[in-house]
From Swiss-Prot:
InterPro entries: YMF19 (IPR009455), YMF19-like (IPR044975), YMF19-like_N (IPR003319). It comes from the Eukaryota. Its EC number is 7.1.2.2. Pfam families: YMF19, YMF19_C. This is Putative ATP synthase protein YMF19. PANTHER family: ATP SYNTHASE PROTEIN YMF19. It is an enzyme of class 7 (translocase). GO terms for molecular function: ATP binding. The chain crosses the membrane at residues 7-27. One of its GO terms (biological process) is ATP biosynthetic process. GO terms for cellular component: mitochondrial membrane; proton-transporting ATP synthase complex. It is found in: Mitochondrion membrane.
Length: 158
């Protein structure tokens, strides 16, 4: 674009103003322009922040319910995986007995799975909402479950 000089100043200024005012009107219209989208986003952020405050203001029992559901889901997944391992170990053990070779000692899982389930359910019931240190109890519960895994691999659980 050439520099503004005395002869082309008016035409360049005219086209510049026409272009930018058209662009400005397109941006600032009340319909679907960019500012309309920004207003929608501002309203959405206000609603989300308001919703977040209402979620945080609920009683802590709902957090306990979420925690219990999470633990029960974890226990059910763990029990399902133990059941599948049990089936696999039985199949491999049958093949080993048939060939007179013991391939796997089943990791002590047949005797340990029931005791493991009992200990997990006991630890979950121990972390009740009436406990004042519920997060410490859950942390202890997680450590107990890890300890159960270590014992489970070595033999039976008493």
């Amino acid at each position: 674009m050439p520099q503004l000089d005395k002869f082309t100043y008016f035409s360049q200024f005219f086209w510049l103003c026409l272009f930018f005012f058209t662009f400005y009107i397109f941006i600032c219209n009340d319909g679907d322009g960019v500012l309309g989208i920004s207003r929608i986003l501002k309203l959405r952020n206000q609603l989300l922040s308001h919703r977040g405050k209402t979620i945080q203001s609920k009683d802590p029992n709902s957090l306990e319910d979420l925690l219990r559901k999470g633990f029960s889901t974890g226990v059910s997944y763990m029990y399902a995986s133990l059941f599948e391992v049990s089936q696999w170990c039985k199949a491999v053990d049958l093949l080993g007995k048939r060939r007179k070779i013991t391939l796997i000692s089943c990791f002590g899982e047949i005797s340990g799975s029931r005791g493991m389930e009992r200990n997990i359910l006991y630890n979950i019931s121990k972390s009740s909402p009436s406990n004042t240190g519920r997060w410490i109890t859950c942390r202890n519960c997680r450590n107990d479950i890890m300890l159960i895994h270590a014992v489970h691999g070595q033999g039976s659980i008493k």
